[in-house]
Amino acid sequence: MSGTWMTVRAWLLMLPLLVVMIAVIGWPLVDTVGLSFTDAKLVGTAGNLVGIDNYVKMVSGSNFQRTLITTTWFAIISVAAEMVIGVFAALLLNQDFRGRAVLRALMILPWALPTVVNATLWRLIYNPEYGALNAALMQIGLIDAYRSWLGEPGTALGALIVADCWKNFPLVALIALAALQAVPRDVTAASLVDGAGPFARFRFVILPYLAGPLMVALVLRTIEAFKVFDIIWVMTRGGPANSTRTLSILVYQEAFSFQRAGSGASLALIVTMLVTLLAVAYAALVRKSAGSAA
């Protein structure tokens, strides 16, 4: 069978999927691009053509800049914490001890639960009147009065980061745990015989096997954290005083709360471009890793 026919056959097999992708992704994207160059409202007339004014106003506006900083801090801190906690949990659950299977199953639970459920549970924990966190901190003497952790600008973002880490660190742990299964036990045993300590054993024996999978987890979690919406919307709706407003929430507010469809479309495309840059960086890292391995 000729190479040309194989290529044609491959495209024919992919054609139904391409049609679906164009219908579901392509056309709405084209429509959004067109909408972003207008001053259209969510209801009413189609709006007038304004060129790149929406993009200029969005990028140069203080709301966008503050929100971008908040989103970046949220992504950096939450992903870093998830990576550290996830790797530590994987190393712990890779040991042989009674009840390991039960702990592995329980660890998956926060990640398996719907985000709305997780967010609701954490709202109850942070509740300023009867929340478990306030009660525990009062018992050990760290606070002398109940606090509104989600109602104060100084603590709201940190409280959200904790909830997000709780939700997503199991994914990192599962990826790391799967990679740990590939570490040869004879190599680990040899390092023990050679007198390698825990840190040296992790650095020179275990980490090389974890590097590739952890890079995948790092990039995927960074992309997800950068476009986070659901857990923040359920817990704070971007408040108080916009201290927890992320880019995705700003897009929602611009398009639906303020009913500025044109501005919302331009902002959505800006966020899409930022996330695409992260995806391109991920692809470049994968190619570089594959080239190094070859």
Show the residue positions of the predicted features:
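Cytosolic juxtamembrane amphipathic/interface segments immediately preceding
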Residues: 1-2
